[in-house]
């Protein structure tokens, strides 16, 4: 039984009691594995575009008249980026020396190459409050790239990108950035400082909105017996619902096309041409696919769903060829209803990069409960390694997900889809954590590009490795994509 205090706490967060009870039930039942048919590969599931096709889709994007908005998840702190340096600082404080060849030693040896170089005590300045405090800052506010007359943060590099592929005919560039509440002021101050500079440089007008993960998307933690985890003061412990919680933020944006890329996946401007080129290709592909979907739905309206066999076969072929949606045999009247339902969904085109490491999470062909197949992006934790078919599919994976998405989010009547209705709630995650030394179970919502977009028409397109340049550790800033040696 929940106490009155706990019920008030749930209501204050905007969490419906029914949602709360469903979350508790999820802990008890767990989340089922999806049925994997195969890894998506160039043979089936990933489009490899010819030079002519690439040129065509760039032209489609450049002539697109709709409203494009960049969406940048940027709420994570840079703690992991500096993990090795924190450990080294602790060892130095204990009287130990830096191990030769260690990440911290490489950091110190190359300190002059970093854009935030300062000749003072580097580790202290980089990590701790009353100095740079980089260890607890968001990645978006850390200087990544050094230029002749300026240094740039990832946030600024996204402003530059937006001007080069998301500027409309009026010169407007729209961008929504999700940030944590405690760091929003820092982003707003940086934006105010640099906005005019980049507007003049790129002849554009920025419209940047900062949003926060909504408290109603947080999920209660439970103890190891699946009872709500209670803190010492009697209140419940809620934890962030993961990046899937950002679906609510995405759903609030009024745009025709949303371009999604993580905050740390940027390059210095001299290498930006390929990134811009491929972003335009993905935008062109997504908007062309959407136009074809709209044409079929309007034709179905005109015919009042009394479709000739040839058109039914054509639509089935389109869904299978473009989105890997294979529809099983069924009576014709039921089939037309299924085809309409499958067509009338948001469209996303996702860049996929060739695997160079161990296979794991990435693009897969999934068999759904309704008997149809679809393309899905899975995390490694969603794959049942004990299932031979799933394990073999994972071993056969050729590409991974760099989080490079273009989403067309309006229907054929010009109305915004309610994206919250196109998810698979049974694709969440459960993990074990701790709070103040006590073990607990934490639950995450279906990932933003995973189960949160399960019921979308999805196409995967092979993109080059140069479009994927995340900064996971501070030493990644020494790679040629980020550093001028």
Map each language-model feature to its residues.
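Long, compositionally biased intrinsically disordered regions
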Residues: 1-41, 334-344, 348-349, 356, ...
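Domain-scale recognition of functional cores that engage charged ligands
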Residues: 7-8, 14-15, 32, 36-356, ...
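Conserved catalytic alpha/beta cores of large enzymes that bind or transform nucleotide phosphates
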Residues: 129-135, 264, 269, 279-317, ...
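Active-site rim segments in enzyme catalytic domains, especially the processed small/beta chain
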Residues: 389-393
